[in-house]
Amino acid sequence: METLLLTLLVVTIVCLDLGYTLECHNQQSSQTPTTTGCSGGETNCYKKRWRDHRGYRTERGCGCPSVKNGIEINCCTTDRCNN
């Protein structure tokens, strides 16, 4: 009986952990804040910032992309950390 209860406890913990989805902001520049659930077990959110002819631009989303010189990027690992 104890073994069965322990097994059920372990299965419950594993299932709850596998169901976790990181949530990141995904609005662009000065738009109203929105969020998205990241897919594929993604563990990072990013905030990318650069300047063009319109001024400073901001992009947010899931992942941690590589960027070219002159583009600032901040990556983080907690829910909605890229605001």
Curated annotation (Swiss-Prot):
Q: Which family does it belong to?
A: Belongs to the three-finger toxin family. Short-chain subfamily. Type I alpha-neurotoxin sub-subfamily.
Q: What are the alphabetically sorted keywords of the record?
A: Acetylcholine receptor inhibiting toxin, Disulfide bond, Ion channel impairing toxin, Neurotoxin, Postsynaptic neurotoxin, Secreted, Signal, Toxin
Among SUPFAM superfamilies, the record links this protein to: Snake toxin-like (SSF57302)
Kindly provide the name given to this protein in its UniProt entry.
Cobrotoxin homolog
User: Would you indicate the residue range of the signal peptide?
Assistant: 1-21
Site features described as May be critical for toxicity, chain residue numbers: 54, 57
Per the UniProt record, the source organism is Naja naja (Indian cobra)
- Cellular localisation: Secreted
Q: Which GO terms describe its cellular component?
A: extracellular region
* Purpose of the protein: Binds to muscle nicotinic acetylcholine receptor (nAChR) and inhibit acetylcholine from binding to the receptor, thereby impairing neuromuscular transmission.
Please give the tissue specificity annotation from the record for this chain: Expressed by the venom gland.
